UniProtKB/Swiss-Prot annotation:
Cysteine pairs bridged by disulfides in the record: none
CDD domains on file: YlxS_C
Gene: rimP
InterPro entries, per database record: Ribosome_maturation_RimP, RimP_C, RimP_C_sf, RimP_N, RimP_N_sf
Functional description taken from the UniProt entry: Required for maturation of 30S ribosomal subunits.
UniProt subcellular location: Cytoplasm
GO biological process: ribosomal small subunit assembly; translation
Family membership: Belongs to the RimP family.
Name of this chain's protein: Ribosome maturation factor RimP
Amino acid sequence: MTGLERQLTEMLEAPVVAAGYELVGLEFVRAGQHSTLRIFIDHENGITVEDCAEVSRQVSAVLDVEDPISVVYNLEVSSPGLERPLFKAAHYEQFIGHEVSIVLKMAVGNRRKWKGVIQSIDGETVAVMVDGQEEHFALSNISKANLIPKF
């Protein structure tokens, strides 16, 4: 998580929770002149388009006042979806036994991309079973992690 993403998470968590939703996480993606702020929300009853629109209005109001982003960007609010991103230790705990795809910031064993089943989370380290071998990754070294849906 970048410094800006951390700042945005701290700024936006309270309004999202006040609206009755969980802020699963967010991503700020810079792509030339087309940057995007993606906010993932969840609710015990699921997420509708109306829920996303409501949170978008709430978040937009905060962003307009605080103005933390210095470039032009698009705001996207959505559910985490089938390939749910994992941002926090609690997310890994919640999905123990599920298959995950992980991209590391710094390679471990000459690899940055890993797929396996979440075994456990201990503080800031997640254990993942990869091809019959348990691998351990520091959450601070995980650039991106997503559940792999089963059909």
